[in-house]
Amino acid sequence: MEVDILSEDENSMLHRTDIQFEIAHEDATPSRLSVRDSLAAKINKDSDEVVVHKLDTKFGMRKTIGYAKVYDSPQSARQVEQDYMLKRNKIEIESEDEDSAAEGA
């Protein structure tokens, strides 16, 4: 699987970079997690800092166009992203019990 970055837009207010990318693949559309790991390796980031939002493969084509958000830290991703998107990308969500325990310590 080969990842090519098409565009990068810096969003300093939300501590992230929005990336559009293209993937060339031989078999079926790769999973969201394998795309996330490949993209993270390409841009030298931790996979918890990358949230893949969209993967679009045209019928019969062996390339996929995607959209991802790359955050400065995993904490920034947890603060900004919605829970369902974090679950799709297998990023751990901090529960309220953990937050209140951390505040009380």
From Swiss-Prot:
GO terms for molecular function: structural constituent of ribosome. Signal peptide: none annotated. Keywords: Ribonucleoprotein, Ribosomal protein. Gene3D superfamilies: 3.30.70.330. The keyword Ribonucleoprotein applies. Coiled coil: none annotated. It holds the Pfam family Ribosomal_S24e. One of its GO terms (biological process) is translation. One of its GO terms (cellular component) is ribonucleoprotein complex. PROSITE patterns: RIBOSOMAL_S24E (PS00529). It comes from the Archaea. PANTHER family: 40S RIBOSOMAL PROTEIN S24. Belongs to the eukaryotic ribosomal protein eS24 family. This is Small ribosomal subunit protein eS24. It comes from Haloquadratum walsbyi (strain DSM 16790 / HBSQ001).
